[in-house]
Regions:
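Conserved anion-binding
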Residues: 56-58, 97, 104-105, 109-141
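Active-site beta->alpha loop and helix N-cap motifs at the rims of alpha/beta catalytic domains
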Residues: 3-5, 9-13, 19-22, 27-104, ...
Length: 141
């Protein structure tokens, strides 16, 4: 089992990377905006994260697109940032279709917002390399 750091904060990523135990990073535009980032700079920020963690550490960057074609287009752009970028896609019907398309192109996908075992199975069947399970989130509200 591997655990990934879920943040957009470069200082947190640098600190975790210095421990030598960082398995990966996941982030999204919402986390980036919480540290003062602007959506227009998100791709550049992903590049900075990739530079910090190095090429052997996967960095999951989330697409905010909502349709299959938009997610695929955004996913291709994200994947072009660095070889260790994993496209993070919400577990929804359009996301499953986009995951299959990207996986068929050899682009790694992390399906997020995965709440149930059946969703995880669907994600795997669609070609996702990773899932980001949300456990206990409803209890936190």
């Amino acid at each position: 089992m591997k655990f990934f750091l879920d943040t957009a904060d470069l200082a947190e990523i640098e600190e975790a990377a210095s421990w030598g135990a960082l398995a990966g990073v996941t982030t999204n535009p919402t986390l980036y905006s919480r540290i003062g980032g602007k959506l227009d700079d998100f791709h550049a920020h992903i590049k900075r994260i990739c530079d910090i963690v190095g090429p052997d550490c996967p960095v999951s960057a989330e697409s905010v697109a909502m349709t299959r074609d938009e997610i695929v287009r955004d996913g291709r752009e994200l994947a072009a940032i660095a070889p260790n970028v994993v496209v993070k896609i919400p577990t929804m019907v359009e996301g499953l279709a986009a995951t299959r398309a990207l996986a068929d192109e050899g682009i790694p996908v992390n399906m997020t917002l995965c709440f149930t075992v059946p969703q995880a199975i669907l994600a795997a069947r669609a070609g996702a390399r990773y899932i980001s399970p949300f456990v206990g989130r409803f209890d936190d509200i």
